[in-house]
Swiss-Prot record:
Record: residues binding heme: C432
Gene that specifies this protein: CYP71A22
Originating species: Arabidopsis thaliana (Mouse-ear cress)
EC number from the UniProt entry: 1.14.-.-
SUPFAM superfamilies cross-referenced by the UniProt entry: Cytochrome P450
Lineage, highest ranks first: Eukaryota, Viridiplantae, Streptophyta, Embryophyta, Tracheophyta
Membrane topology: Single-pass membrane protein
Keyword rRNA-binding (UniProt): no
Record-annotated membrane-spanning stretches: 2-22
Superkingdom of the source species: Eukaryota
Protein's name according to its UniProt entry: Cytochrome P450 71A22
Family assignment from sequence similarity: Belongs to the cytochrome P450 family.
Cofactor: heme
Keyword Transmembrane: yes
Gene Ontology MF terms in the entry: heme binding; iron ion binding; monooxygenase activity; oxidoreductase activity, acting on paired donors, with incorporation or reduction of molecular oxygen
Major site of localization recorded for this protein: membrane
Amino acid sequence: MESMIRIILLSLIIFITILFFIKQKKGKKSNTPASPPRLPLIGNLHQLGRHPHRSLCSLSNRYGPLMLLRFGLVPVLVVSSADVARDILKTYDRVFASRPRSKIFEKIFYEARDVALAPYGEYWRQMKSVCVLHLLTNKMVRSFRNVRQEEISLMMEKIQKSSSLQVNLSELLGSLTNDVISRVALGRKYSDETDFKELMKRLTKLLGEFCVGTYVPWLAWIDWISGLDGQLKKTGNDLDEFLEKVVQDHEDGDAQRTDFVDVLLRIQREKSVGFEIDRLSIKAIILDVVVGGTDTSYALMEWAMTELLHRPECLNRLQEEVRTICKGNSSVSEDDIKDMNYLKAVIKETMRLHPPLPLMVPHESTQDVRLGDYHIPAGTQVMINAWAIGREAATWGPDAEKFRPERHLNSSVDFRGHNFELIPFGAGRRICPAISFAVILIEVTLANLVHRYDWRLPEEYIEDQTNVAESTGMVIHRLFPLYAIVSSTT
């Protein structure tokens, strides 16, 4: 009997597979982008690998800068060139301005009530205006200058105590960004609280998980069996409990504070923006700031120091610039940064080679549209491979894979959404509204690190290729912590 069941199941699988390939062959249309062959049920999911940005870049080299894949039942456009990204994020920006639904995002971010993940519409416009006009203005960014200076000074003191020893730069930079963002958004630091650190680790891991049910709904039971559903529920509840306590403490505390929670509560209380902001929206926006602001800035600084340590000639040139401008000063102030052109070039080059989100948060088309000769139906997801665009030889030349900050010194290309060959923060309506906040922290941190100390890699890491290996997840960090030998210049 068992043998007969196996034969029947095998025959059924073979029959479905044959039907799939017949349908795929007959259904191929000339007005759709090129597509790699796909498997029944899962489509092209098997081709993503551990590092989807690299796998998709390899596929685009074969099938072109605009590919149509299927992740389970979901059609997904993969964009791997600046020209096509311009079409998506500028020419047809409104059509592609929405976000696809995701169980992970909805469970964690209050049914996508935040700014980064909310579907395009009136609610999203209202929440974005709150962020742009009240939380992330140039005035607000400047107002937290002392916070940045204080936390950088504390980091430098930690380094001073480790002189001539190996320093874990990854740990230091992670703590710095966590402390700065926590003080700005939540009003105080949480780096000494084990529960908070563990919660952030769980959250970061979950955001990089693959949710089967999102792409193959009738296989959603796999997410339950794998434990993903349980992890989402627990982490979502723990985050809400934490954020609720933060908001409650602010309501009961000093009304004169000006961190982000206080600003949002004041807007809610005074009804000063012309629409209601409820408690869930406040918590979702704060979660956006904490998650997005901490991980991305930390990753960029970690990769910048990685590249500089592996290229001492670049590090020496940066040190020469910073030390010349700040000669006689014990530290670098934010006012000094404006004249540091090579520093800005180093940061641009890091963003080009190591965008913190190599695959940008997916977009989704809200109506049918034509991209060149291709018909793109409503409901199509779009994945823009910022990592591949930053390494496109047609744009950056034959040395596109090489870290060479000099390429930016006489270039007008910037990362603020106007030049589509460099889009680490996105572009168009969905561009990250916190660019200025992130960049000033990155600039002043790197400048102080190279101004006060000399750095070199430990001998055992110089030729070790695993020392530049990537982690997995939504935000790409180093696979292993970055260690460096430090010595004071004084």
